[in-house]
């Protein structure tokens, strides 16, 4: 399933990749041509990842491989929702300065194959874990 998240804080230029292990990891785990958008009103486009990472919205997981759980939390001080819910520390958080809304990312220890070749039990279990985290975080379930 497609998940997009805002990358406004991420990549101003490619030099940031050498400075931040999380950005390097994210870049390496991206699809070769992820969906991305400058403005969601105009829809999504498939672009090479070196172009896609410069867009405000990007597909965070590969089409058939899940590396991360992304959560969109639309309330003030949402960046600490994981702490307030007594959950493990996320891989990264990003907060919008104008309203305090946030994105929270958890990295899976092992990538999960989500294609028809993947384990149905593992996919089902991951979906339940993701739904449980979303509920505890008070995240947007439609994200």
Question: Whereabouts are the PLM-identified features?
Answer:
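Flexible helix-coil linker/hinge segments at domain or subdomain boundaries
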Residues: 127-143
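Short C-terminal domain-edge/linker segments immediately following a structured domain
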Residues: 99-105, 134-139
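Signature for HUH/AEP ssDNA processing cores
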Residues: 1-102, 108-124
């Amino acid at each position: 399933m497609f998940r997009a998240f805002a990358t406004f804080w991420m990549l101003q230029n490619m030099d940031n990749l050498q400075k931040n292990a999380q950005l390097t990891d994210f870049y390496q785990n991206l699809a070769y041509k992820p969906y991305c958008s400058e403005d969601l009103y105009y829809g999504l486009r498939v672009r090479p990842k070196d172009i896609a990472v410069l867009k405000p919205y990007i597909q965070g997981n590969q089409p058939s491989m899940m590396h991360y759980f992304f959560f969109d939390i639309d309330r003030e001080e949402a960046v600490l929702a994981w702490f307030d819910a007594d959950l493990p520390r996320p891989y990264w958080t990003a907060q919008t300065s104008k309203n305090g809304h946030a994105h929270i990312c958890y990295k899976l220890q092992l990538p999960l194959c989500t294609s028809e070749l993947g384990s149905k039990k593992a996919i089902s279990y991951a979906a339940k874990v993701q739904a449980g985290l979303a509920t505890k975080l008070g995240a947007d379930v439609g994200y």
